[in-house]
Amino acid sequence: HEDWGCKRIHGYLSKTMKINIKKVHRIIKENNLQVETYHKKNGKLNTYKGTVGKVADNIINRNFKTDKAHKKITTDTTEFKYYEKDKSGNYQTKKIYLNPFLDMFNSEIISYSINKRPNYKAVEEALDKAIEITKDQKEVIYHSDQGRLYQIPRYVNTLKENGITQSMSRKGNCLDNSIMENFFSIIKQEMYNKKVFYSFEELEQAIIEYIYYYNHK
């Protein structure tokens, strides 16, 4: 794939063979296959507003490995930009927000929502779908950063009511949720980089199609 970077190629090849990431990097370099680096602002939405509710312990503690599906789930919100004409015919920058829930077992996106506003309703839509998928498992953990939408009682109580343990990254430490950061990097490199979208519907459809491709590739 022309937009795949070293890490993505290594991950794909590792499914069928043993290969060192350094060797993958060397082969890419020798054959001049390196993709153009993604330079756009990462678009990660900073929803941290201090402690506005309950901050959970960092139970995951960067241990993203699990031998069963639907046991360790993580989430976050990221933004994408598109352009839309106003009444004067001038293009205005608009934003779209993606709220995915990712299974750490295989990095599959088990649910997501796409919205024009980064509010709790958007998160709740994806959360409800994720819980429906993981409800038959025991000792399930849902991880996130300390964003305000994950601290509020409605989110915390929904997890409790469904027997789900909540885990949160430490403040300002993106590596505590690097598995989700990696997905955001991949989707923006492969679907969003060097492309311009001119409506909410166009960008929304591109995200939907990409997540399907990502999950089924």
At which residue positions do the language-model features occur?
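Charged, gly/pro-enriched flexible loop segments at helix/strand junctions
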Residues: 211-217
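Mobile genetic element proteins and their domesticated derivatives, centered on retroelements
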Residues: 9, 24, 28, 60, ...
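Basic, flexible linker segments flanking DNA-binding modules
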Residues: 1-68, 173
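Short small-residue beta-strand/loop micro-motif enriched in glycine and branched aliphatics
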Residues: 106-112, 166-169, 193-194
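Hydrophobic (often cysteine-bearing) scaffold residues that line and stabilize catalytic clefts
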Residues: 2-6, 20, 52, 56, ...
